């Protein structure tokens, strides 16, 4: 059982992964859930080794000057690891995604059509830093009967090896073939993975804007994901200002490197003179660098915001602020500069909230709460493989439902199409069952 794929032809590796995934998909839901529990226990037993491996990655990252946003994603402490393990167990409690009947219809007596959910097959997941993504994605793949080829960034290599070794140990202890989860370890394998359009069914990139765009532009395999996380918080004229300050603090500082952290704050001009000084005091105490438009700078002393700031994902303790004339102006700004990820309004006006929720074009639109809630675990999805900002589903945080497709099953008793065509054609009953 090898953690890495370096000595193996990737096409052959993908074939082995698919075969193991087919075996996994054929298991009962109980068996797959037992495998997840075995993986969770194995990760707990290997916690010291995993955290030590991550410390090695973090030390090397510091020596090489890794960007702060990436370092934040790379660092894996005991709390984050425990949360990832809890996510594995929560996935085991979710409904089985395989074999669900989406449609059942009688075409004629004794001719029954069903549409049934089934695994996608083999996933290729490429991510920067984010070693906890190994745990999330592996759990969802096991539950949904998919195989996965994991390719982490070189900065997370030791962490990924330790995590996948523990996952393999858990699968083996449950009597399952660990080949359904494979780890690629060299940079050259990233491009090679993107070329496996006959062996890999879906690519899921997780990382920076430039990274995701690179993946999208270098593969013929369908890609699930988002390139940017430019999220906004709009504070309306009827907002509870104390509540708005707390939401802004959480949405910007709770995890600034997250793709659902806000990058721009929009404030209604009627409350800006009262609200902005409160906000600035709170955020600057937390070391947030503030940039503002001209109207903002007339109220609080901050650096000027350039046009490019409205289209920038900082992934850091930096926030751009703009004073807007009204709700319509806020919505127009968001629909112009937003990345269709997650947008929020703070207001006591239900009509304003309804307008915002209906007219803002994003995968997630929130009222009186932080954008940081846009997360598969917090949505009750168990975990997520990523967030999609595409218009076609799946959209938003993607959990199990995004890892299955469907097939049509038609069961008859010798029927042929000629019976239902021509001048004496027998009519279909088309009766939903």
From Swiss-Prot:
* MF annotations from Gene Ontology: glutamate-5-semialdehyde dehydrogenase activity; NADP binding
What does the UniProt keyword field contain?
Amino-acid biosynthesis, Cytoplasm, NADP, Oxidoreductase, Proline biosynthesis
Its EC top class is oxidoreductase
Key word Repressor present in the record?
no
Keyword check for Cytoplasm = yes
Q: Primary place of residence?
A: cytoplasm
Instruction: Give the EC number(s) listed in the UniProt record.
Output: 1.2.1.41
Localization = Cytoplasm
Q: Name one GO biological process term.
A: L-proline biosynthetic process
Where is it found, in Gene Ontology cellular component terms?
cytoplasm
Please give the pathway this protein is involved in.
Answer: Amino-acid biosynthesis; L-proline biosynthesis; L-glutamate 5-semialdehyde from L-glutamate: step 2/2
Which Pfam families did the record assign? Aldedh (PF00171)
The record lists the catalysed reaction(s) as: L-glutamate 5-semialdehyde + phosphate + NADP(+) = L-glutamyl 5-phosphate + NADPH + H(+)
Family membership noted in the UniProt record? Belongs to the gamma-glutamyl phosphate reductase family.
Q: What does this protein do?
A: Catalyzes the NADPH-dependent reduction of L-glutamate 5-phosphate into L-glutamate 5-semialdehyde and phosphate. The product spontaneously undergoes cyclization to form 1-pyrroline-5-carboxylate.
Specify the protein name: Gamma-glutamyl phosphate reductase
Q: Which species does the entry assign this protein to? A: Cyanothece sp. (strain PCC 7425 / ATCC 29141)
> According to the entry, what is the taxonomic lineage of the organism?
Bacteria, Bacillati, Cyanobacteriota, Cyanophyceae, Gomontiellales
């Amino acid at each position: 059982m090898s953690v890495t794929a370096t000595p193996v032809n990737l096409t052959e590796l993908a074939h082995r992964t698919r075969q193991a995934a087919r075996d996994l998909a054929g298991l009962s839901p109980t068996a797959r859930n037992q495998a997840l529990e075995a993986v969770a226990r194995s990760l707990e037993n290997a916690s010291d080794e995993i955290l030590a491996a991550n410390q090695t990655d973090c030390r090397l990252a510091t020596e090489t000057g890794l960007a702060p946003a990436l370092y934040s994603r790379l660092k894996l402490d005991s709390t984050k690891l425990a949360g990832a393990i809890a996510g594995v167990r929560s996935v085991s409690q979710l409904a089985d995604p395989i074999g669900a009947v989406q449609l059942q219809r009688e075409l004629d007596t004794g001719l029954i059509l069903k549409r049934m959910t089934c695994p996608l097959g083999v996933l290729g997941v490429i991510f920067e830093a984010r070693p906890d993504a190994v745990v999330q994605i592996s759990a969802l793949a096991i539950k949904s009967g998919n195989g996965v080829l994991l390719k982490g960034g070189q900065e997370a290599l030791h962490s990924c090896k330790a995590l996948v070794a523990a996952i393999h140990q858990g699968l083996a202890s449950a009597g399952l073939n660990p080949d359904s989860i494979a780890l690629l370890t060299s940079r050259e394998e990233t491009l090679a993975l993107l070329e496996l359009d006959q062996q890999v069914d879906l690519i899921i990139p997780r990382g920076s804007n430039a990274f995701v765009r690179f993946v999208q532009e270098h593969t013929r395999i369908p890609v699930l994901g988002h390139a940017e996380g430019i999220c906004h918080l709009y504070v309306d004229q009827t907002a509870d200002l104390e509540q708005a300050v707390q939401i802004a603090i959480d949405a910007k500082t709770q995890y600034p490197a997250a793709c659902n952290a806000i990058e721009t704050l929009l404030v209604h001009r009627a409350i800006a003179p009262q609200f902005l000084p409160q906000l600035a005091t709170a955020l600057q105490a937390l070391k947030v660098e503030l940039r503002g438009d001209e109207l903002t700078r007339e109220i609080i002393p901050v650096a000027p915001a350039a046009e490019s700031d409205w289209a920038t994902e900082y992934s850091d303790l930096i926030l751009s602020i703009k004073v807007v004339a009204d709700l319509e102006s806020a919505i127009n700004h968001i629909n112009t500069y937003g990345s269709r990820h997650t947008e929020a309004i703070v207001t006591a006006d239900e009509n304003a909230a309804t307008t915002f929720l209906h007219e803002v074009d994003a995968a997630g639109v929130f009222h009186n709460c932080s954008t940081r809630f846009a997360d598969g675990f917090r949505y009750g999805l168990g975990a997520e493989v990523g967030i999609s900002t595409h218009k076609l589903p799946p959209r938003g945080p993607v959990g199990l439902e995004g890892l299955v497709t469907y097939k049509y099953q038609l069961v008859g008793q010798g029927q042929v199409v000629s019976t239902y065509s021509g001048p004496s054609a027998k009519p279909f009953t088309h009766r939903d069952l």
